[in-house]
Amino acid sequence: MARDEFTKRIKDALAKRVCYRCSNPNCRAITSGPHNVQDRFINVGVAAHISAASPGGPRFETGMTSKQRSSIENAIWLCQKCAKLVDTDIETYNKHTLV
């Protein structure tokens, strides 16, 4: 089974909705910054799945459709550190905590 990825449009909307800040209330790190090329920027944020994008992933729900797994309702914008933390400690960061 393939991963149910977010579209670029969803990723962009998710980042902009939180002003490119990590959505973890204990972090709130800025996830974008300037690039040495003036019309570019560096992004260190990720659109993370609340319920995993594929079987075997953290918080995977068999009852979800592919469309539901790849929707903005199943997404959270995080810095890379928090994304790793959320996917590693699934007891602390369960679906209800992330929503």
Regions found by a protein language model. Give the residues of each.
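Short metal-coordination and nucleic-acid-contact micro-motifs, chiefly zinc-binding Cys/His arrays
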Residues: 15-23, 71-75
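Short cysteine-rich clusters marking metal-coordination/redox-active sites
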Residues: 22-27, 79
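Histidine-centered nuclease catalytic patch
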Residues: 2-4, 29-75, 86-93, 98
